[in-house]
Amino acid sequence: MPRVCDVEVVHGVQNGVLIGDSGIKPIWEITFHTGGRKSTGHAFLMFMVRGLTGDGPGARVEVNEQFVGHILRSPGADTRHWFTQTINISGAVLRDGANELEVHAAANTSGNDQFDDFRLKNVFCFFQQDA
């Protein structure tokens, strides 16, 4: 039986969105759509991240108010370099329609600021569809 997959561009801005003390706010929220998704299937979020270089836990990620994983840090990395990361999620987390993605700022354990500022860009959701 063939498997069908679709992709949703959640956010695709060249410079990315800034999250943290210097950002818009410490939680970035955006709506994306996964019409026809297979609830028993698999999905993953893919994004590029830059500047998340401090110590401590990464940035918390939620879809539809459910924790799905963390954006991992790259301690000591060059803050000018972009890194690709993915978070695997269950198709059951996604709605057959509008979904809410939340990315929380990561705590800064080694500086004066409350958060470790970072940028996200090229955010995609790949998901299985009902054939």
Segments from the language model and where they lie:
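Beta-strand-rich recognition domains
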Residues: 1-131
